[in-house]
Structures are given as structure tokens and as C-alpha cells.
Amino acid sequence: MDKRELIIHMLRQLDEQSRSIQQIGAGYYSCVPFARRFNKLLAEARTLFETSDGLMGTFEEIPEFDPKDPADKMKIIQGIRVEINQLISLLEVAEEDASQ
């Protein structure tokens, strides 16, 4: 398994964990571990590309912030999940292009 596949696998697991923790409800979770892990995986994914131009340049680190309001927490987790899935898509397409 190459680095790209490992990152994709880890991103999928992070998405699954964020989904399950969000189902607990009432905001009894922290957003920080999810943002922190996403940022680390994003940094690793960037090393797979020659430059940060193009689509990889559209990704930004997610602030490691933990609001008190449950609705705000849900918005942050949803944003993280969107970024996770977009990054997975980019990595999968880049993998397909590399194999052709």
C-alpha cells in the first residue's frame, strides 16, 4: 500500500469517526481532534504533489477551535467532513491519473 492509499484510508476512517461522534448529539464532543488530524493528513497529502498550485491549493488548514454552542460544533464537523471527502476525491483521481 502506497502513501496515497494510506492517506485515503485514514481520511475515510476520520470521516467515519466524525460521523459516529456527531450522532452522540447535544454537542458532547470536541472538534479539535478532528481538525488537528485533518490538518496533519492534509500536510501529508500535499507532499504527494509537486506544487500547491491547482486543486491542492484550494485546501486550507482547519482552525483548531472548539465552540461551546452545539450547533456551531455541528457546522465545524460538517465542514471537516466536506473537506475530507473532497480531499479523498482529489487523491483518488490523482491516483488514477498516475496509473495511466
What are these regions (language model features)?
Residues 10, 15-18, 59, 91-95:
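Generic low-complexity, intrinsically disordered sequence content enriched
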Residues 10-11, 44, 80, 88:
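Enrichment for repetitive, rod-forming helical segments
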Residues 65-100:
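Amphipathic alpha-helical binding modules
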Residues 1-32, 84:
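Short terminal alpha-helical segments
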Residues 7-8, 16, 41, 50, ...:
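General helical structural elements
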Residues 17-60:
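Amphipathic alpha-helical interaction modules
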